From Swiss-Prot:
UniProt protein name: Cytidylate kinase
Enzyme class: transferase
Catalytic activity entry: CMP + ATP = CDP + ADP; dCMP + ATP = dCDP + ADP
Location(s) in or outside the cell: Cytoplasm
UniProt superkingdom: Bacteria
Length: 210
């Protein structure tokens, strides 16, 4: 029987790094569900198709191959902007959630991270984590990341973008971002990834022994 770990949280809270570390440690399959929305958006952009046509976007979502998700390519800013436009479409969410649910059934276990894993995709997951941090800390991390990659960052613009993204994710009518009632809260504002990982590991190990 498979063991699923559901990890949710806002942008730049550290859930992606934490999820990959957990999956590697336990030998589980990992899926960053945000990449499924980005890949769908990229397919539309590559085909020169509009981002406001739900039927076309749904068709692309249904044809998505989860094995072909390239984080480096899909991390581009313009793809993220396009993804945020299709992520609010109910038919697109429905198609991608179905694919994500199938992924979650892989043996021996899976780690899925996103915005609605513990509430919608895997509501019965034995471990649910909600990874968060203050908007200021998350904007600072994103700013530092851009500088580290040789880019030019505007902290105020990044902070405004983080706040706008939060409002969009939490105010969405379909599957808004919120912690599952039985999720363990990990606030990484003043916590290193290693400390967050050790806290998560304690929770996971306890669940595996049940």
């Amino acid at each position: 029987m498979t063991f699923t770990i559901a990890i949710d949280g806002p942008a730049a809270a550290g859930k992606g790094t934490l999820s990959r570390k957990i999956a590697e440690t336990y030998g589980f399959h990992h899926l960053d569900t945000g990449l499924t929305y980005r890949a769908t958006a990229k397919a539309l952009l590559d085909a020169g198709l509009p981002l406001d046509n739900e039927a076309v976007a749904e068709k692309m979502a249904l044809e998505l191959d989860l094995a072909g998700l390239d984080r480096a390519v899909l991390s581009r800013h313009e793809i993220g902007e396009a993804a945020s436009k299709i992520a609010v479409m109910t038919p697109v969410r429905r198609a991608l959630v179905k694919a994500q649910k199938l992924f979650a059934m892989r043996e021996p276990g899976t780690v899925l991270d996103g915005r609605d894993i513990g509430t919608v995709v895997c509501p019965d997951a034995p471990v649910k984590l909600y990874v968060t941090a203050s908007a200021d800390v998350r904007a600072r991390r994103r700013y530092d990341e851009i500088l580290a990659n040789g880019g030019n960052g505007d902290y105020d613009a990044i902070f405004a973008e983080v706040k706008k993204r939060d409002e969009r994710d939490m105010g969405r009518a379909d599957s808004p971002l919120r912690p599952a009632e039985d999720a363990h809260l990990l606030d990484t504002s003043e916590m290193s990834i290693e400390a967050a990982f050790q806290a998560a590991r304690t929770i996971i190990d306890a669940a595996l022994k049940r």
